[in-house]
Amino acid sequence: MNQDTICAIATAQGGAIGCIRVSGPDAIKITSRIFTPARKGKKLKDAKPYTLTFGHIHEEENIIDEVLVSLFRAPHSYTGEDSTEIMCHGSSYILQKVLQLLIGNGCRLAAPGEYTQRAFLGGKMDLSQAEAVADLIASTSAATHRLAMSQMRGGFSKELASLRDQLLHFTSLIELELDFSDHEELEFADRSELCLLADGIEQVISRLVQSFSVGNAIKNGVPVAIIGETNAGKSTLLNALLNEERAIVSDIHGTTRDVIEDTVNLGGITFRFIDTAGIRETNDTIENLGIERTFQKLEQAEIVLWIVDATNAVSQIPQLTTQILPRCEGKRLILVFNKTDLVQDASTIPNSSFTVAATNVQCISISAKGRTNLDKLQQMLISAANLPTVTQNDVIVTNIRHYEALTHALEAIHRVQQGLAENLSGDFVSQDIRECIFHLSDIAGEVTNDMVLGNIFEHFCIGK
């Protein structure tokens, strides 16, 4: 554990109030050097934990600001160390001045994520809970908030601990049998019972692995590719969905040559919209590169919005059949007839959609420019996302590192099942059980190396 005392601004710039966190063995002593309580005779070191003390930050005889200081004593603090939090006015000058005074009296400026890293190293939380802190800070919807809170409160950790306990019991039975292999009359592990235990563990790990598709969509947004021919109104639709001028709109064909991505929350679900280059035959090298990226993004999307210019719908349907439908297997495709405000005979639009009715493609007619039926399109997107309602009691994997570790653990438990089925020696089975335990422990940070820890915590903000 580090013996130095760290400090950092914990609040965003521009607010009326700012907060500076101080943590480490000398946190209270250093804060006392620059802080004087307003009540005469009172000293910060004598204050009770979890209380606020009003007073002044000073530089020699000069008062810098009126502040409130909260005090936390080890181990009952976020980091598990002695800590103080200085609430001052949000002026950038005041905040920087207080930091300078703290550093001048023995503090060091905290590295990104160092407070949470100290909490992890001090046993206040495991690594998955520490990562949930970053997810909570970055949460942009009710669902991402609920998942982060569940993980931070230890829901995922308890699931992992239960699995590890079962696996440790499993391997102890196997290894005990190995230790007494010379005593043929003794049988410590009934293979049929071990098979049932392995099956139960496999089901839990498999459920966690499968939950990642939902968790990843909730955390990073459901990827929605907006594709179509040039000048069909793709960028206009993106701007309408985002309620801002995110993409350049022009009557010139091929204006969008690169991929544009942005997110929006609809009905509590985050969607990641991907505006792509229009599909057409062209000799323009740069535009062709954009079209190649269009098909790449189409492969990555879960939902595809195929935008068709309703004024010329009949000519665009063949392209849908030959180029788009074969690439949309397993995806949800919504055929969007745009520019309906320019169509004189609306009956031509249903006739066009009838040609793809057998493919279970959903169809809708809109005017992105006039915002006609946009609300209906949004409801179709929410329905197509088909995400379950998430509660704080649900254990859903959202982190790619956790997913990879669980995938390796699942492979190991599959080898255990196979070994038991083939009646292999306990030596081989025990090795795979230990590998499964290793991967589960890696998630909680029990076997994680310093390089991995550094990569995780350096993505936190400095004050966390």
Segments and roles (model prediction):
Residues 21, 238, 275:
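Short, acidic/hydrophobic/Gly-rich beta-strand patch recurrent on exposed beta strands
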Residues 273, 307, 336:
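Generic enzyme active-site microenvironment
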Residues 53-73, 254-282, 300-303:
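Switch I (G2) and immediately adjacent beta-strands of P-loop GTPase domains
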Residues 287-311:
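Inter-motif core of Ras-like GTPase G domains
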Residues 2-9, 145-265, 282-284, 300, ...:
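C-terminal-of-GTPase-core extension/linker across diverse P-loop GTPases
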Residues 108, 270-272, 362:
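Conserved beta-strand segments of alpha/beta enzyme cores
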Residues 1-146, 150, 154, 327, ...:
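A glycine-rich (often HGG/GG-containing) alpha/beta subdomain
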Residues 14, 25-27, 73-77, 91-93, ...:
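Conserved nucleotide-binding/hydrolysis micro-motifs of P-loop NTPases
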